[in-house]
Amino acid sequence: MAIPVINAVINFSTGPSFAQAMILDTGVLDTNVLADSTAIIVDVSNRVNRIETNRGRTALSDQFQTGALTLRIVDQNGDFNPQNVSGPYYELLTPMKKVQITATYGSVTYPIFSGFITNYVTTYPDESGEDLAITTIQAVDAFRLAQLAQISTVTGATAGDLSGTRVNQILDTISWPLSMRDVDAGLTTMQADPGTNRTALAALSTVASSEYGSLYVDATGSFVFQDRSVTAGSIGGTPTVFADNATGIDYFDASWILNDVLIFNKATITRSGGTAQVASNQDSIDKYFLHSYFLDNLLMQTDAVALDYAQAYVASRAETSIRVDSIVLDLYTDNYNSGIIAALDLDFFDPIKVITTQPGGSTLEKTLQIFGVRMNISPNSWKTTFTTLEPVIDAFILNDTIYGTLDYNVLSY
């Protein structure tokens, strides 16, 4: 049975880039990055004891969160113990060094996590009850760096900038590499930057919210900004089908849920310097009671756009239905080639359809989007969990059998 090969690499160079340094007359153009010396990069793949990654968006905060990694490596010689003064990397074992996890399967290498080390903890057999000395490395993705960076003035951030332009201006302010960005142009024009003291992450999140788009860090370590047209339209792609009745990729477990977490039937959206714009759905309020949503100090230029936001939000959230909360894939399942590829390749906003057979023979079927990816990997186990949610914003999608129904789907702004 073929299983993906884990690659775990610690990069002791400075700066945000995960690439090897470019050395004149030696380096490879379009592969290495320009630097003054070779980065010390250590492959710890053959020492891996366990890997846990968690990236995604939470339903309650309605935003993507900082991704996290726990990497446990066998460390019998204390090479990665920062207290070992005779260790080969002693002076290099400091916080914010880079770590990257990938998986190779069928000659394709898939990114799993790229981030920055926050701490090292070494435990010994007599302390942990294990037979081996283990160093546990914990890391976070680039959201943490943006959260740590305080900014005020954003150069060039004038009224009329599209949201994507503003995102790039903020990333320029913290000197984030151009090669580590995937930024859509955006549809909403911004006010001039307020110039207040805040974190870069707060500034980026305000722009993303003003656009009604999405901001996250992908598995390669790049900042990704999607405008609302991409966010809304991505559900219209061809879904990967997971089913327990042989009509799709088999899965280990699927958790179905029906609750009120995603219901919002009144939204109050206020732009900076504007008046509160309110939208509500009385039928939903009568049915579910009042579920309110507030967002203020946004940067769209007009109250009309703020009202569009409020109306689109309520139209997308006034109703709910049974949905798949999460689906688990076991990569050690026999004859699981398609499942392994899906587990490694699918990521945020990818549409999936889940089919579950109920007692009595009826089926539950739902098409949703992936908004969270969690992996738990050990020498004899590999499970990938996708958390799923309804689209961030509903939109009418032409020729789509689910999101292209007149009198049912929403015309977005």
Name every feature range the model reports, one short phrase each:
Residues 131, 135, 163-166, 265, ...:
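Alpha-helical structural motif
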Residues 62-85, 183-230, 234-237, 241-413:
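An acidic/polar, Gly/Ser/Thr-rich interaction patch typically located in mid-to-C-terminal regions
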Residues 174-178, 361:
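Short secondary-structure junctions
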Residues 145-149, 178-183:
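Short acidic/His/Gly/Ser-rich catalytic and metal-binding motifs that mark active-site loops
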Residues 162-175:
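Short, charged, amphipathic alpha-helices and their helix-cap/turn boundaries
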Residues 94-98, 160, 347-351, 355:
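Glycine-centered loop/turn motifs
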Residues 1-159, 169, 191-212, 217-219, ...:
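Assembly/oligomerization scaffold segments
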